[in-house]
Amino acid sequence: WLLEQQKYVFQNKKFYNYKTDYFGPLLDETGKIKSRRDLSTLDYTPDLMYIADVYGAVDDTYGYYDNSTAKGAGITVDDMSVISYAYENGATVVAEMELFNSGLDSSVYSQLSSLCGIRTTGWVGRYIYDLQDFTDVPDWAPPMYEKQDGVEWQFSGPGILLVSSDRIIILEQKTDFESKNLLTVRINKDFKKQFGSCNKVNFYNWFEIVEPNSGTDVIASFEFDVNATGMEKLKGVLKSPVFSAAMCKRVEGKAPVYYFAGDFNDYVSHENYNRFLFAESVYRWISYDRQGDISNFYWNFYNPLMKKIPSGFPSPAKSCE
């Protein structure tokens, strides 16, 4: 949406095309991987490389629960070579969660971790609007919990699900949190000047718990509004209810690398309005916090964040600075 609405173009002034400039798993109508457009076929060095949803949305565990990788999905050794080459030749890299699936080749894992400037913990989580709604709760969660704790799944209402390869934790709004703002995301103080247009908002999606390497800047943080009971459940997972959401690694002479520890770009806009001059302002104005609705996060946090990242890209309309 952003590339189209903001009129970003290649250096030859041609517009980006999400159908031809996308590489990775290609899905059929049922969401199954039907083929793959290999990154190795890329024949130019991009200004921006955005890496997300590398498993093709075929598995809502992100590989952490069943330790599997769908055939044709994930970052391959060849993909990593292209990514590294693009970065070394000036490309800005933006990556979202789920890159570090447990089935990843060890050399690729090491290179990705170094490139993004982060360390994984093996924990992912998700906001659940109603823990009794099994169209929203992942189907593997109740049996995993019941096997682990030996009791029936009897949770209800909004909550947070946390899972690793061998453990699951459920936090309920009614018992483990101070308010209905279970998980928020905000820009950190040192980056308010650059990203001040990003509002503090609730986050209602998948996220992961990662740790920044030394020298990696934490632009934004997640925060659980847990009470003492909730914090007790988080022992061994987090030392603090505040953890990294958006990070940036900068190396002198290289373009920055951004890592988002959440499913940030999970939103589909109304295509008919995309080219409308004031579309972004209208979307921000009509978006408000509705528990479980991701649109407010997209328009009041993610979109203004992304507008500040591709500064210097060719654009006939305007600069992002």
Q: Where are the regions a protein language model picked out?
A:
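A glycine-rich, often tryptophan-bearing local segment used as a flexible ligand/cofactor-contacting loop or short
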Residues: 62-70, 74-195
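Solvent-exposed loop/turn segments at secondary-structure junctions
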Residues: 54-58, 93, 99-103, 223-227, ...
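Extracellular/periplasmic catalytic domains that process cell-envelope and extracellular macromolecules
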Residues: 41-44, 86-88, 211-213, 251-252
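Extracellular ligand-binding/catalytic regions of CAZymes and related secreted enzymes
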Residues: 1-17, 192-321
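Post-signal peptide N-terminal segment of secreted/secretory-pathway proteins
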Residues: 7-84
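Extracytosolic and intramembrane catalytic regions of membrane-associated proteins
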Residues: 36, 43-45, 59, 156-158, ...
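Loop/turn elements at helix/coil->beta-strand transitions in domains of secreted/extracellular proteins
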Residues: 44-48, 88-94, 255
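A structural signal for short, well-ordered beta-strand segments and their strand-loop junctions
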Residues: 12-14, 50-51, 92-98, 259-260
